[in-house]
């Protein structure tokens, strides 16, 4: 399906998979709405897309955990930006890897508020317009952690299992409306994910990917673009993308020197 001229909203667009998706959709000549919490990074990304791709880009510093801010921002979009064709729900994070009885409740709340509630707030604000127009595509960035669990992944896995369930339920809710619903569920991707999980411990984060070649953010963005470009009668409901060295959450092959 031709994407040129389509309006794409990407959450968590300031880095990693979100930024890679922005570059991919800009290369496909889409109009970009980019939101994230870190304004300086958004401004840098928007400037590069305008310079390198002559892209039409609008951006906003937005925390998807703030329901009122999300509703106000979507409701206040300028006339030319209100018809959002593709929503990429990318904002998400993991905090900590402790067993549940040692977990930090603040970490739990941040994951639940971002990964699940933030996704719900943005989708609730954008979806009515898609349904009214009889066309649109919601692409949720899920995770292999939405299909499997692993030691210490308790609350993060719970949020991603919730996203997987929501994705399937939303596909039923929108059946017959012309709106497609997709979940792209990557395994190990080398972004800031592990650095955030371990609260800035770069050494521990680097160890996650030692001895293997993980996915890149661009690999995931390519999968997202593939889903978005299927013909209107076809929908990729779930796409699980893993590095070749990974067969599951705990089944990973690492090369040893």
Map each language-model feature to its residues:
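Conserved glycine-rich cofactor-binding loop
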Residues: 14-15
């Amino acid at each position: 399906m031709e994407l040129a001229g389509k309006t794409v909203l990407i959450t968590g667009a300031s880095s990693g998979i979100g930024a890679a998706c922005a570059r991919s959709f800009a290369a496909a000549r889409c109009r970009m709405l980019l939101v994230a919490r870190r304004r300086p990074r958004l401004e840098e990304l928007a400037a590069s897309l305008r310079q390198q791709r002559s892209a039409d880009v609008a951006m906003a510093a937005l925390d998807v955990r703030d329901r009122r801010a999300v509703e106000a921002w979507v409701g206040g979009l300028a006339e030319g930006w209100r018809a959002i064709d593709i929503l990429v729900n990318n904002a998400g994070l993991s905090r900590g890897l402790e067993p549940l009885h040692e977990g930090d409740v603040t970490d739990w709340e941040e994951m639940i508020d971002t990964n699940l509630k933030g996704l719900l707030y943005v989708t609730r604000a954008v979806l009515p317009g898609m349904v009214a127009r009889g066309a649109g595509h919601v692409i949720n960035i899920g995770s292999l952690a939405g299909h499997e669990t692993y030691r210490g992944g308790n609350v993060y896995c719970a949020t991603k299992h919730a996203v997987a369930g929501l994705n399937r339920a939303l596909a039923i809710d929108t059946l017959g409306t012309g709106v497609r619903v997709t979940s792209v569920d990557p395994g190990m991707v080398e972004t800031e994910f592990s650095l955030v999980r371990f609260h800035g411990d770069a050494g521990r984060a680097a160890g996650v990917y030692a001895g293997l070649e993980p996915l890149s953010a661009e690999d995931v963005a390519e999968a997202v673009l593939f889903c978005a470009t299927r013909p209107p009668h076809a929908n990729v409901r779930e796409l699980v993308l893993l590095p070749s060295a990974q067969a599951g959450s705990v089944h990973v092959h690492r090369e040893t020197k």
